[in-house]
């Protein structure tokens, strides 16, 4: 059976296209007393970008902090903030949820849009296709490129027991606004780590057992764009990286990621690392599985003067190490894409432990 997967319904791309947001949202406002919820990374407080938000009188602006990886408890807190606002007299769901920021902010926006129409805690839905009700209309506006969160069907969350996404067709954004100008102020190291998330998406997709002509076409183009951005640093690198993120996300939508992402989930869960740097730390020790990709990755690191932290796992207790292994091992589709249906014979607990202990 071939997958019949959902994609983002509408996309606008171009420098300055953020200015069209008011027109885009106007068509979704159902009544004069309706409202939208804006989730915006708090690094933009008192910024020029905040002043450009097309807020209406009853709209709700929630500043989100993404110093840590998005957690299910935080999603539940934000969802309750919206529900409390509704109960203050509006008595209706918002007409839309808009996420403005990097991958973590976009994941939070996706999760809140889902949880406003589904009961319980977001932790109840960590897994594959557990969501029953469609999300609120939701929009992504990336201010950092690489994660592919703007096109993916997952919202990656750290819960009480595991780091695992809410994977559902209902998670996919209805609209994305891709304005390269919004990414121009990103710190260089953060831009690199997030860009490498995209590069690693491509490596894992293009070398995986789930590879097909669809995922290959998107993956190869995204890989070429990553090379232009991180090895050649030609003109319009912000626009190219934004499109690499989009294409890389589309590539894994019809295939899957692999070993690096599985190990990174374990690292992030126990050490509370951000996804991008967690991927970089793990990928640097995966020459055995991705020799060409790791070689090129190291070339990119050298060109951009990136030094990764070392020895993160060396003094770790056995309980934490076992928890990392547990988190990584539940990601069956990632391992199968990387190593095939018999992956458990190759990637044993001892093998994963050996890889982690190098980090």
Predicted regions and their residues:
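Carboxylate- and glycine-rich phosphate/diphosphate-binding segment that chelates Mg2+/Mn2+
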Residues: 154-254
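Active-site pocket-lining segment
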Residues: 265-318, 322
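Short glycine/serine/threonine-rich phosphate/pyrophosphate-binding segments
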Residues: 18-21, 45-48, 104-110, 148-151, ...
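Glycine-rich phosphate/pyrophosphate-binding beta-alpha loops
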Residues: 146, 250-274, 279
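Glycine/threonine-rich beta-strand-loop-alpha-helix active-site module
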Residues: 73-80, 85-181
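ATP/NTP phosphate-donor binding region
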Residues: 1-96
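C-terminal charged capping/lid subdomain of soluble metabolic enzymes
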Residues: 6, 298-359
């Amino acid at each position: 059976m071939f997958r019949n997967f959902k994609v983002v319904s509408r996309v606008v791309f171009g420098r300055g296209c953020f200015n069209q947001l008011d027109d885009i949202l106007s068509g979704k406002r159902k009544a004069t007393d309706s409202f939208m919820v804006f989730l915006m990374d708090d690094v933009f407080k008192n910024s020029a970008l905040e002043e450009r938000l097309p807020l209406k009188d009853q709209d709700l602006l929630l500043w989100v902090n993404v110093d840590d990886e998005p957690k299910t408890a935080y999603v539940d807190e934000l969802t309750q903030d919206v529900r409390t606002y509704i109960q203050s007299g509006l008595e209706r769901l918002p007409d839309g949820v808009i996420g403005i920021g990097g991958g973590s902010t976009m994941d939070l926006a996706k999760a809140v849009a889902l949880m406003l129409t589904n009961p319980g805690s977001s932790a109840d839905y960590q897994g594959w296709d557990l969501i029953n009700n469609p999300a609120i209309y939701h929009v992504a506006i990336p201010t950092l490129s690489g994660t592919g969160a703007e096109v993916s069907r997952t919202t990656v969350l750290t819960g009480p027991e595991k780091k695992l996404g809410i994977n559902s067709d209902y998670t996919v954004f209805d609209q994305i606004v891709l304005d390269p100008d919004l990414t121009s102020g990103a710190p260089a190291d953060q831009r690199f780590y997030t860009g490498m998330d995209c590069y690693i998406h491509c490596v894992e997709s293009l070398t995986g057992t789930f590879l097909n002509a669809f995922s290959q076409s998107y993956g190869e183009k995204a890989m070429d764009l990553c090379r232009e951005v991180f090895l050649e640093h030609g003109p319009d690198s912000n626009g190219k990286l934004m499109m690499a993120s989009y294409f890389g996300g589309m590539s894994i939508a019809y295939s899957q990621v692999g070993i690096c992402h599985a190990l990174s989930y374990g690292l992030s869960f126990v050490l509370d690392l951000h996804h991008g740097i967690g991927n970089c730390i793990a990928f640097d020790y995966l020459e055995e599985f991705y020799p060409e990709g790791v070689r090129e990755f190291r070339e990119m690191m050298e060109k951009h003067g990136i030094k990764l932290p070392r020895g993160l796992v060396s003094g770790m207790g056995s309980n934490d190490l076992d928890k990392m292994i547990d988190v990584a091992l539940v990601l069956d589709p990632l391992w199968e894409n990387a190593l095939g249906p018999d992956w458990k014979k190759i990637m044993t607990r001892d093998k994963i432990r050996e890889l982690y202990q190098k980090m």
